[in-house]
Amino acid sequence: MTLNTFTNNHLNEVASTCQKVIPWFEGIDDKNVQEKRNSLEVKLCSLIEEAKTAYDVLPVKTTVGVFGASQAGKSYLVSTLASFGGDDLTATFDGKKVSFFNHMNPIGGDFEATGIVTRFTKFDDKGVSGFPIKVKVFNEADLVKVLINSYNSDLNLKAVPAGSQSDYLSAQNQKIGSTEFLKNFFEDLKSDKYALKDEKSYIRDYDVVSIAKYAIRKSKSDFGDNAKFPIDCYFWSECRKLVSKLNFAGRAKMFSILWNELDAFTTLFTELGKQLLELEGASSVYVPLNCFIEDPNANENDFRRREDGTLLDIGVLKNVFKDKDDPCKSVEVVIVNDGNEIKKTISFASLTFAAREFSFPLPKESNADGFDVLDFPGCRSRKTDEIEKFKDPNTDTTEYLRRGKVGYLFELYCDRHEIDVLLWCV
């Protein structure tokens, strides 16, 4: 079985057309049109997101997802489904034979071992010379959702901070429920200090609608109450209108209200968001073998995993702040834009966060005939921490990236309808 008949679906043109329609409202004086403008723009933004997703997903083979807490069970299932007779899963990249289990897949420890979805497929993207492995990556909107996920799943929002009469959740609801607060909040964002000037921004109005939908679903605050904060309400409408006009500091301020302006989470957004800007909004990049192999120039028989963790190793995220200014801890990647190969440099820890899927090509004799296998990171139960712990400067905030990313990944693939059959490992 080859790629399905939806390869040339032209849904990208639907998305592009909808994007061109939105500015049309600016020149229309008709009162009836203007009254419906906001809701129509939201619907168009939703259609853009859905069309872009369908354009990406429809051409892909039927997918079998493998998900669950059992790492050993998942590895066995993946090996059975994707290999030939239980053989080792190997592939050739830039003329070098690499083993998935021996050279790429991390060894589990006391937390989730992997933080990326692996697609085992017979569709072989040869990549770029020197950068043979294709990796799909998060964008800024995904980063916001990861932080929303962790803030609402990993923290005790019902706790009452010292010296306060209200718990964190009640205080947040009181703040965002104030018309005066929101008015002043957006007036400040419209000031010149937050205006987009020489910087680049790759987040769009339709991304805000996607974030709004996610916040409605995940937030424990009133942001999760569709009656109080529907996607066409004042708050989300102002965010949607402003987002493409804001510099990075402005976007950090705007999105921080979604996690009640918790400094630790805003710092995570700031550090990773700046790194994501280096990828210029790309949905995928090509990476070199040294993202997995300690010395790709060694003899194949001497290949071994990167000593500080491979791109699949979610434990690498603990180095997000440690490695940001160390050029030795950076990696060069390639973005392909309109046929042009553009090299970019990003910290390896940040790339490990950004990476959401990488493709491992299967041999023709593989058991996966006619379908792809998606190996998801192992899931773990979530625990709720006290927000007071952030007063300790030694608190490792990167663990919330780990928890949020693993939790968000599976939701993302479900939302995008990228899983046709799910095998649950217990």
Regions found by a protein language model. Give the residues of each.
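Conserved glycine(s) of the Walker
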Residues: 72-74
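Short secondary-structure boundary/capping segments
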Residues: 81-84, 94, 387-392
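P-loop NTPase motor domains
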Residues: 362-373, 378-387
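N-terminal low-complexity/disordered regulatory or targeting extensions
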Residues: 1-70, 83-364, 368-370
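Inter-motif core of Ras-like GTPase G domains
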Residues: 382-426
